Amino acid sequence: TCLAPWNALAVGLAESDTCSEVNAGNTTFTDAYRDVAEKIKVLLDYAEPNPYAYSYNDACTAFARGESAMYVIGSYAVPQIQSVNPDINIDSFTFPANDKEEDNVLNSGVDLQFCVMKETKNKEAVYEVLKFLYEDETIQIYLDEQNAIPCKEGDFTLPSMLDGMQSYIQEGRMADYQDHHYPSEMSVDAMIQTFLMDDSSNAVDTFLSRFDKEWKRYNRDLIAKVKKYQEEKGEQ
């Protein structure tokens, strides 16, 4: 669950195109993520004792049982929480990463989708299923069950537990998850947890330096393509 507060902070404290800018050589994570790293450390002062002992399921269960008043997680966790306590009354708000409310950004993104492969047989049958799934009535059922936000424009009713985020949704004050741009093999979640457990005075510098180093390691092919493109376009 380390990535949940990390993403919530990053969308408000770093530019949404940070990863692209790093690939282009215009910035580094040491510069772009310093404020994020420093503030996620501060969160530990408000956490339960030994928060590292909680897995995602453990944290959802603990919150459902009233063992914590707030849980830094996305709305996607609500079904898991309600499976333990169906009668729980949940509200939510956008993470206050900045001192000024108008500078805050809602963390929102799509990490699940349907697709039809080129070589798929019986495509018409598949399209019929997708058409059904994309009907307003079907989408509303999904929203009600999963406390989700629709990716389709229409007259949908959002779950009441998202009332605290309505203004951000209506105004489009949202940004994608930063970790959607991280290579899975980079294991950023483990890097963040290691950083949070590091009590040394230079923990932030060590973490950010490692982030830059690991990023180059796991994105070297993409970075090379970006560099080649820039050279061809005369940008460098």
Name each model feature, range by range.
Residues A69-G74, D91-F93:
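Paired acidic/hydrophobic, glycine-rich loop segments that form the ligand-binding mouth/hinge
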Residues E171-Q236:
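Conserved C-terminal helix/tail region of periplasmic/extracytoplasmic solute-binding proteins
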Residues P51-R65:
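Short helix-initiation/N-cap motifs at beta->coil->alpha
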Residues D45, S83-Q146, D198:
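Extracytoplasmic/periplasmic substrate-recognition and gating elements
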Residues V22-Y52, F95:
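Glycine-centered hinge/linker elements that transmit conformational signals in sensory
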Residues Y56, I73-V78, V110-L112:
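Beta->alpha turn/N-cap motifs
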